[in-house]
Amino acid sequence: MKNTCKSVAAFALLASAWPLWAQTAPAETAPAAEPAAKDAKNKDEVVHLSPFLVNAGDSSVGRYSSLESTSGGRVRVNIMDSSQSVSVITSDVLNDVAAGRILDATKYIAGISESTLGSNAQDRTNVRGFQADGHTVDGFTYGGFINLDPAIVDRIEVVKGPNAILAPQPTSPGGTVNNATKKPMFKNFGAVSVQVGQFDANSASLDINQGIDDHMAARVVASFRDWDNWWQGAGIRQTTIMPGFTYKFSDQAQVTLQYIYTDWKSTLYLGLPADPSAGTNNTARIIAGVPRDLSVYNENDIYRIDQQHDWKLLFTAELWKGIQMRLSALYHKTSQYAPQLNTSVHTDGNRDPLTGDFVPGMQFLQVPPYTGSPIGPAGRTFTRSGTDPRNDPRQTMIQNDYAYLFENDSVKSTTLVGFAFTETTDYGNMAHNINAPAFDIDHYVDVPWTMGTLNFDNRLSNQFKQAYVSETLSLLKNRLILNGAISQNYYRQRARYLVTGVFHGNAPDATLPAYGVVIKPYKDVLSLYYSYSEQSTANQPSNSAANTVPPLTSSKQNEFGARAKLWDDKLYFTVSYFDIVQDNFSVPNPANLTTPPPNPLLPPLFSDRTAKGWEYELRANPTKHLSIIGSYTAFKNRDPNDVEFRGTAEKSGAVLASYKFDADTPALDGFRVAIGVDYIGDRPGDAASGLTAASTPTNPIPNQPSFYLPSRTLTNLIIAYDSKKHWTVQLNVDNVFDEEYMMASINRSMIYVGTPTNFRGTFTYKF
């Protein structure tokens, strides 16, 4: 991961282009006010912001808070008026934590935590306990191996729970994490940033914005990474370039064009085995006797590569007085390859049929009286095998919305009508079996894998169509807000499996309602809300002759909560209770991780699940110097047998507090100090399913997870100095107290080991 020459050369080339440029505005956000050098008459003009855009500069409760969002209902709404839980991460949070991945910032939002993969791919997170893969960028959701580079992100809007009118439907019923990209603004500015550090650092970024004239603005953001992970020989190399152009036809109409290029390569590190002593009811630890940073994955032949191209269009206009329109489109093209070797799980224990608990060092009769007896150690040699999947998807997405805004002395109405279309094809979805020799974990030596037989070769296509209508009424001087929506969704799935000679297709549809109410007893200080919403996603048919995969996965949520904005708007607090029911939930089939893997790979498993619990969030700016964001979540996310899901921590919390010195303390003027603390509770380390042999119809005994990742609390320190002469230096110390922890896991043989204390330094020059 030391190949930096190309990145440095490209960075220098972009930097040298500065004199040719002249600036833009935040993602799905409005361009900033035009240059002050306009004539005096313009000072009296009113700039009308499209209801489909949000002002990225909004921070009415301090640096860490914005109370406007467009992600929940297609149009801009004050969060105090929303009947669904919505949270915003501002650019100040992203900058203060020097975010290397999106989760570095979103972990301060209630309900969001680490999932089953570590920090080196896919931005996989848990939202209200539901695993969410891939990315939502400017309202469009797509997959990939990459971690989205926060350098191109202006703000993050999180909508909790199912949402009937989002398109395409969210991949997780827990919610949607929408990353709003940086967009052209009508002013001139630029910034160059360089970061160096021990691990997960060594990067450079460039952001140049130019207001060309009253009608045109341009912006280019570029970022280059050459990271070394803490694990031996592992790293990430990434290039992201995002040019954008905005043309303003008038104050009521503008179009923005963007292109995002991403080139990604990361070591496919999957972790180390658990110690054989790990069981359901004790504290798990990494296998003893080996370095915690040991990697048994050779970066030269066990890796993920992903090259993505995104072409985007956003057009907003006022068609007639009170009638607004938004047209947004994306063409997404990606090529992916990821040879993956899975380490076999040792038989170092078994589940007790009478309890379902995994007991290390024991075996049990599967017939009465289900007695146990010791087994010998499984040894320290591990077999492994896997596949080398390739994907070549192409996606076309279109969203078209129309809003009619009406207001008089007694009522304010927002009527929305919208349409959406998504088409995805992947005619390069294939993989071979790959094999590598067994390895002794005490004397590991890299040995290249060899390719075996073809595992699968698929031709996949799917289509999504949506039409929706939504109405929001504000009554009694905005004291009572009612909203309702209905969405009609049509799906078409086609899958041809060349290895098995099977073709399946289905065309389900769904009618999804949503409604809510907001009551504001006292002005804009207290907001009480309730909402109900549904969503659905289509499932890919199975590769077997009998298609047993349900065509749709559906989710329903009831949510209620309260928001308070106090202390002259310096304090914002929210508490919410949610109850989500999901049917036909898809989870990876653990049998695909066996050695050798099934040929072809088995379809996912499906289960129903419920999630219910409480979330608490705080934003505060008690003084002009102090900014705070914090959250705590306590919930249950279980299957029908009341068994927890792999990687889901049912308790989590985080707080970030920043203090900025100014001229009131001359000796420290310009310094900023922040402390971030995040906690994740115990969570299952592997997926458990089914019942034990001792179960009866009246006494079912579910299998329990074989081990749990222990809870952990990490503390991060930030010290920064903002010069009066355009430059900033910042030191981030991650995991200050050097806590040893398990970051995530796939099963007993693949546990991501957490990074120890890590120092990262960032220098930024603004012009």
Predicted regions and their residues:
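Acidic/polar loop-and-plug regions of large Gram-negative outer-membrane beta-barrel proteins
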Residues: 225-229, 242-248, 252-318, 324, ...
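Acidic, small-polar-rich N-terminal luminal/periplasmic segments of exported/outer-membrane proteins
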Residues: 50-187, 560
